[in-house]
Amino acid sequence: WEYAFLQSSFHSHWAWKYGSTMKFDIRYTNRDCIDTFPISESLSSEIQNSLENIGEAYHEHRKQIMLAMQLGLTKTYNLFHSNAITAQSINDKDKQVVSLQKHLEKTANTISFDEAIQGILKLRELHVQMDEAVLDAYGWNDIELKHDFYEVDYLPENDRVRFTIHPDARKEVLKRLLELNHKIHEEEKADGLFDKKKTVSKKVNIVNEPQAGYGGNLFNQEN
């Protein structure tokens, strides 16, 4: 069930916020992106099963659509995040759409263009369901995620649009994750899991409220 947490928009935004970067690429490391990411260990079996089921469904569909299109992760997610592909319309002049059409035409044993589009739309639907399941696991159902295409300010200006949660939801989620990180850290200190000599937690590493610098002060700025 941890897979659903780590594939969620919550974790993606957390990793971009607190992970280190090289140019505009994230350096995804356990210490910066996983060890600091707060996941409750006291989830009910019902919630764990829900997370496991949606995580498996998402993983399996992604694997099958990639195999059917004969595309790797990067190109698949380029399509996933392309606002030229929606349930209402397809912009057949968009470079991602044109590239997909040409690829499917020249590559043997692939699915049709329409099937590929439906597969991408289904992947988005599953991602929304996974985010909602993670939201429920945290008990933050007062937050409206409002999935759609939004600009994210940690990417280059010419490539900022992503299919993700609303900027207001992102800001609130990051705020609560930071608070939860601190709460878990304090609980670990009380349980003797904090190594004072090394000043790091043996389980969940604490992260501080960000000041000016990479990512900006997300909690006090409109995004």
Which ranges hold each PLM region?
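S-adenosyl-L-methionine
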Residues: W1-N223
